[in-house]
């Protein structure tokens, strides 16, 4: 399925961009109007990696979702726009999104 519109975030409602590779998952909150990354985390971060046995599971994605939500809420940002990239909203992508929602982010 091809998306024709590009997703853009603002300072009030930045973009939560998710990238999934075969081994890791990355999440970052981006303000597209200034081109700045506000917060980011991945399964490569020391605090996240220490909690995991395997970085390519849905459980790892849930932990990344919880961590990105905590970091974003610490910056007083409650609403984001979810950007899954070209990936289908399934598996590790949906696990990260649901964990971020349960931790308090709104999208």
UniProtKB/Swiss-Prot annotation:
Assembly and interaction partners: Part of the 50S ribosomal subunit; contacts the 5S rRNA.
UniProt similarity note: Belongs to the universal ribosomal protein uL18 family.
Protein's cellular compartments: Plastid, Chloroplast
Annotated InterPro entries: Ribosomal_uL18_bac-type, Ribosomal_uL18_bac/euk
Function per UniProt: Binds 5S rRNA, forms part of the central protuberance of the 50S subunit.
Record has Glycosyltransferase as a keyword: no
Keywords: Chloroplast, Plastid, Ribonucleoprotein, Ribosomal protein, RNA-binding, rRNA-binding
GO molecular function, one term: 5S rRNA binding
Predominant localisation class: plastid
Name listed for the protein in its UniProt record: Large ribosomal subunit protein uL18c
Regions annotated as coiled coil: none
Pfam families the UniProt entry points to: Ribosomal_L18p
GO cellular component, one term: ribosome
GO biological process per UniProt: translation
Organism: Guillardia theta
């Amino acid at each position: 399925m091809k998306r024709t519109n590009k997703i853009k975030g603002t300072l009030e409602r930045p973009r939560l961009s998710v990238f999934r590779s075969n081994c890791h998952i990355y999440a970052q909150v981006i303000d597209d109007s200034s081109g700045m990354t506000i917060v980011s985390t991945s399964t490569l971060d020391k605090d996240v990696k220490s909690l995991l046995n395997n970085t390519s599971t849905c459980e790892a994605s849930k932990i990344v979702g919880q961590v990105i939500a905590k970091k974003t809420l610490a910056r007083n940002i409650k609403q984001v726009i979810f950007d899954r990239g070209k990936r289908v909203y399934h598996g590790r992508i949906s696990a990260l999104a649901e964990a971020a929602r349960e931790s308090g982010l709104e999208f």
